Structure formats: structure tokens, C-alpha cells
Amino acid sequence: WIMGHMVNAIAQIDEFVNLGANSIETDVSFDSSANPEYTYHGVPCDCGRTCTKWKHFNEFLKGLRKATTPGDSKYHEKLVLVVFDLKTGSLYDNQASDAGKKLAKSLLQNYWNNGNNGGRAYIVLSIPNLAHYKLIAGFKEALTSEGHPELMDKVGYDFSGNDDIGDVANAYKKAGVTGHVWQSDGITNCLLRGLDRVRKAVANRDSSNGYINKVYYWTVDKRQSTRDALDAGVDGTMTNYPDVIADVLNESAYKAKFRIASYDDNPWETFKN
């Protein structure tokens, strides 16, 4: 999965997919009542990027729906996964469940079109704080009470705080999550970070009793760091330059071993050689 980083304006969806992304990451900010408000990152952000592009969240979802609904004039067949980077740092811990409920209702209405031929992409809810694990239950509860529990089949999870792998496993246990787990690891492209924790996450993914289904590394902008991440066995790389990742995947060393994921590749299934 080539994951376009910080896609917060509707026009950027086309831009990143046309560069080779089959997945995008979008920032979601919340207001003081835990309503998802804007697709917005703010400063500071990655080096070489504009940090301040934004859209009202529900409007962005409508644009995203068009980009992932077959038959729509804006449809991109290869855009198959969306990671919502949930900026829950502005919320109190006891608002996490409410944030999940409100997020689910926004998605149900504006992205899934109330279950009637909405967008088809798989969705990852990426949560920065382990203490906010109740967001997951709130999300599920809202979809169930609105009569669409089947949409949970399209939803996965990520705790993005680079916490100890054991602590992350524990948070999922408390959240009642078994499966659909992506594990991120990374740091802004302005700084360097080793691959030690990525290797631990990959080892957990490949063990018989691990909780992780997929591992992605961020933010990967250079050819060499792409090669290093692929050599470590990641399933996805988040990048500001999807064309760089696509180029490396075309190199003979990687062509035989990796391919770009399509809609038929289940993002919740651990890949077995």
C-alpha cells in the first residue's frame, strides 16, 4: 500500500492517486464537543509540505465518496484504503467514546451514503493515544444503533503513538478488538528514525499469536529509506512522494517480491508467503 500523506483537500486526492498512491491519509481535527470538524494538520508538519490545507470534514467525505464510488466521474479504481489520522489530542480522555460515535455518524451519512452505494474504500481509524481506546467501541456502537453493523467489515484500527508493542496489544484487549489491526511506526520526514520497532511489529505480525495484521512506516520520501522499509518487510509506506515508492517497487530487487495492492487484497488479512 502506497499511502499518500496528509491529503486534506479534495483536489489532493486526484494529485496523490495520479502520482501512484492507492491509499491516502487524512488528518481529522475535533471541536470541543468531540465533533469531527476539519481535515487539517496545522503547523508544524513534514518538511517541504504546506501544513495548512483544510476542508470541513463532512465536505471532504463527500469528495472522498465520489473518488471511491464506481461509476462516479471522479472515481479512482486504485484508491482502496483511507487512513483517518484522528487528532484526538485536543479532547479529554472521557470524550473518546463520543468522538467515535460522532465520527461514525459523519462517515455513515457522508461517506457510506447511509449504506446505499457509498464509497467502497477500506477505512483505518488511527488513534494517537492508547487512553482513547473507547473511541473504537463508540464508533461500533453508533454504526450498530444506526442499523449498519456490517460496515464494521470495512473498518480497521491503528494506534499511532509509537508505544511499546505490548502496551498496544493491551489497549486492543481493553477495546475488545481482535483483527483488522494495522500497526504504524514512524516520525516526521524532517527527522531520522531507525527500523527497530518496525522489525518488532513485523515479528509480531508474522508470529502465530501476534495481534498485528499489517505494518506501515512513515514518512518515507527517499529511495533508500523505501528500500530499507521494504527490506524490513512492511506492508505499506506512508509518503509525500508516491512516485518515489512506485519507482522503487519497479526495481528488480522488489518487483518479484512486492506488488501494489488492489481492491481484492484484503487489508485485514496477514499476508502469508
Swiss-Prot record:
Its tissue distribution reads: Expressed by the venom gland.
Question: Which molecular-function annotations from GO does this UniProt entry contain?
Answer: lyase activity; metal ion binding; phosphoric diester hydrolase activity; toxin activity
Q: Which residues form the active site?
A: 5, 41 (nucleophile)
One GO CC annotation: extracellular region
Q: Identify which cofactors the protein needs according to its UniProt entry.
A: Mg(2+)
Matching entries from InterPro entries are given as: PLC-like_Pdiesterase_TIM-brl
Give the principal location in a single coarse category.
secreted
What EC identifiers does the entry list? 4.6.1.-
Entry's Gene Ontology BP terms? killing of cells of another organism; lipid catabolic process
Paired cysteines (S-S): 45-51, 47-190
- Glycosylation: which residues? 250
Q: Where does Mg(2+) bind?
A: 25, 27, 85
Q: How is the cofactor bound?
A: Binds 1 Mg(2+) ion per subunit.
Which locations, inside or outside the cell, does it occupy? Answer: Secreted
Which keywords does this chain's UniProt record carry?
Cytolysis, Dermonecrotic toxin, Disulfide bond, Glycoprotein, Hemolysis, Lipid degradation, Lipid metabolism, Lyase, Magnesium, Metal-binding, Secreted, Toxin
Say which family it is in: Belongs to the arthropod phospholipase D family. Class II subfamily.
Its biological purpose = Dermonecrotic toxins cleave the phosphodiester linkage between the phosphate and headgroup of certain phospholipids (sphingolipid and lysolipid substrates), forming an alcohol (often choline) and a cyclic phosphate. This toxin acts on sphingomyelin (SM). It may also act on ceramide phosphoethanolamine (CPE), lysophosphatidylcholine (LPC) and lysophosphatidylethanolamine (LPE), but not on lysophosphatidylserine (LPS), and lysophosphatidylglycerol (LPG). It acts by transphosphatidylation, releasing exclusively cyclic phosphate products as second products.
Q: What is the protein name given in its UniProt record? A: Dermonecrotic toxin LarSicTox-alphaIB1aiv
Q: Which organism is it from?
A: Loxosceles arizonica
